[in-house]
A protein has these predicted regions:
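Structured segments of extracytoplasmic/periplasmic soluble domains
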Residues: 69, 73-84, 116, 151-155, ...
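Extracellular mucin-like PTS domains
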Residues: 27-47
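Conserved SGNH/GDSL esterase-like catalytic core that processes O-acyl groups on lipids
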Residues: 57-62, 66-148
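Histidine-centered active-site loop/cap adjacent to the catalytic His
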Residues: 234-296
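Sec-dependent N-terminal signal peptides
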Residues: 4-13
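Bacterial lipoprotein signal-peptidase II cleavage site
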Residues: 15-23
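Immediate post-signal peptide segment of exported/extracytoplasmic ligand-binding proteins
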Residues: 51-56
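Alpha-helical cap/lid subdomain in secreted, periplasmic
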Residues: 114-252, 264, 273
Length: 296
């Protein structure tokens, strides 16, 4: 019963993103200034030298606005790591409408996802937590995800699939970072188990999870400890706040840091092996590397 409640709460708080205009895009985003410095700190991933030989991938993100900024950032972030020719496709719906089940049950969104897959060039499909069925089944089943996988594989049998975990919305509802992260942290292992069940259903298919939402909690914790010089507000202007609104949409620092988690998930790049992001006083690579150590 406790596990079900944790997963149900995960659904309630993780379907982030206010209801926004739907869109299909092939896009890139923010400029990241860099220096050539690197670090010897290691995580289990590819190094910057190795990345020069990595072919850019075509990635489809289908989901809401607690994942969209990172998808938008991927082309720029991949270039930082020496990866050229990354292609990003996005099918977007706001809030709960961006969960896999909601998108797949919406005929228009479903057709947009299919159209993005139809040329057979998509290497990785990224979806975001959580479908209603996944919650109601206590993390046991999600027909929409299964059908999306089946459709993608029918167009490209080598497609891989990533299930991303965002952060809890409405950050002011939580007294601090520790409370903010509690419910999603509790539900994430069940999400990982669900991904493992998909690999049993599709034995030759790579289905993986990643938890970019954990970056938000790390940044909030640093802010609350007075250790985040780049941020003046919990909620405020995008350039100097963790969140841009009460809903909890990410500010620039959170977007850029979370993008390093996406880079690792998709390309296996160690955050500490890309050039330092010089626009911030904080070394956001260290924050991303810490998240990967905790949740990989």
């Amino acid at each position: 019963m406790k596990k079900f409640l944790a997963f149900a709460l995960l659904f309630i708080v993780a379907c982030g993103g206010a209801i926004e205009e739907a869109s299909v895009e092939d896009t890139v985003a923010t400029d990241l200034e860099i220096t050539s410095t690197t670090s010897a700190i290691e995580t289990t991933s590819t190094t910057i030298d190795d990345s020069k030989d990595i072919t850019g991938l075509t990635v489809l993100y289908a989901g809401h606005s607690f994942g969209r900024p990172f998808a938008e950032n991927l082309t720029k972030t991949a270039k930082l790591a020496g990866i050229k020719d990354h292609e990003q496709r996005i099918v977007f719906r706001g809030g709960e409408n961006g969960a896999p089940q909601a998108m797949w049950e919406d005929p228009t969104a479903k057709n947009e996802i299919k159209n993005a897959l139809n040329d057979g060039n998509v290497d990785i499909v990224i979806l975001i937590c959580c479908s209603k069925e996944l919650v109601e089944s206590n993390g046991q089943s999600d027909k929409a995800i299964v059908e999306i996988i089946e459709y993608a594989l029918s167009k490209n049998p080598n497609t891989k699939f990533g299930l991303s975990m965002p952060w809890a919305d409405y950050p002011e509802n939580y007294i601090d970072a520790s409370e903010h992260r509690l419910q999603i942290d509790a539900g994430y292992p069940r999400y990982q188990q669900f991904a493992k069940s998909l690999t049993n259903l599709f034995p030759d298919v790579d289905v993986f999870t990643f938890y970019h939402g954990a970056v938000i909690y790390e940044l909030r914790d640093l802010f609350e400890k007075g250790m985040l010089q780049d941020v003046d507000n919990l909620i405020g202007p995008e350039r100097n706040s963790i969140f841009t609104d009460k809903k909890g949409h990410a500010g620039l620092l959170a977007k850029d840091t979370g993008s390093l988690i996406w880079l690792n998930a998709i390309y296996g790049i160690n955050p500490m092996d890309i050039p330092k992001i010089e626009k911030y006083k904080l070394d956001i690579r260290e924050v991303a590397a810490e998240v990967l150590r905790k949740y990989s």
